[in-house]
UniProtKB/Swiss-Prot annotation:
Native organism: Thermosipho africanus (strain TCF52B)
Gene, per the UniProt record: rbsD
Protein name in the entry: D-ribose pyranase
Record flagged with keyword Isomerase: yes
InterPro entries, per database record: D-ribose_pyranase, RbsD-like_sf, RbsD_FucU
One of the protein's GO biological processes: D-ribose catabolic process
Length: 128
């Protein structure tokens, strides 16, 4: 049995295969996920797990060099990301553009978060 890290086998597998500049998305409960993109649905209940809970676990194993989020996202949402990834580069685009970009991600992790626009695309970085 695995002792540390991410215990969700699907998330662990996806992170392990990411290369530099590959992208994954973490999205809220209502985000439309393209049918051709791998969906990892971890919703447990309305509101659970939150975006932040999922982000914290993912950051244990993933080096992130850029976060793409919607202009419509709240300042609080942006602050959550800044607190968890202090020196990350941000790219802000429209929510419609963000939805289109999810066509090119390796996987989408669907959370139970119900705060509008709690969606981000994480761009994989390098550890050296």
């Amino acid at each position: 049995m695995k002792k540390t890290g991410i215990f969700n086998s699907e998330i662990s597998r996806v992170i392990a295969k990411l290369g530099h500049k590959d992208k994954i998305a973490i999205v809220d409960l209502g985000f439309p996920i393209p049918s051709h993109v791998e969906r990892i649905d971890i919703v447990l209940d309305f509101g659970r797990p939150t975006f932040e809970e999922v982000l914290k676990v993912i950051l244990k194993e993933l080096e992130v060099e850029q976060v793409i989020l919607a202009h419509e996202s709240s300042k609080k949402f942006e602050q959550i990301i800044k607190e968890n990834i202090p020196r990350v580069e941000f790219l802000k685009i429209s929510h419609e553009e963000l939805k289109k970009l999810t066509n090119d991600v390796v996987a989408v992790i669907r959370t139970g978060d119900v705060v509008p626009y709690s969606n981000a695309i994480l761009v994989s970085g390098v550890i050296f």
